[in-house]
Amino acid sequence: MQKEIRKTISKIKETGLQLLFPGRCPVCDGIVRPFGRKICPECLPKLKPVTAPWCMRCGKKLAEEREYCGDCMHREHKYDRARTLYEYRDVAPSIYRFKYSGRQEYGDFFGEEMARLLGDFIGRVRPDVIVPVPLYRGKLRKRGYNQAACLARALGR
């Protein structure tokens, strides 16, 4: 019973916060409607998901079918595999605002998009945990949050 009451209070609080402080679109930075998608309907088509073929190491879009991009063939990475959600040039301003302008709500949008677009890939990999890359203390103090942790939380939901 108490658990249900806490859940209801939490939902009321969340609803109030969304009404008082609506989120911002990660593409145009305009205000988005509460309780809807976390992106403007006009902006959604501007984001082009990276589709095959892509580099098996870094996830970068490839012009032709092959295993690795030119960078990964000549460079060693500290990871085995990565995937790219969108073309970088389409989301670069958004990533900048997410990292340096306090737009933590972008993490919810991108985390949900990661789950939607990369869910099959993540399911095949079957991770035991999702661990965000830690930030240096100075950067964490300056920004006030770890953007990788925002993404990991949203993806974990």
Predicted regions and their residues:
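Glycine-rich phosphate/pyrophosphate-handling loop used in enzymes and phosphotransfer proteins
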Residues: M1-R157
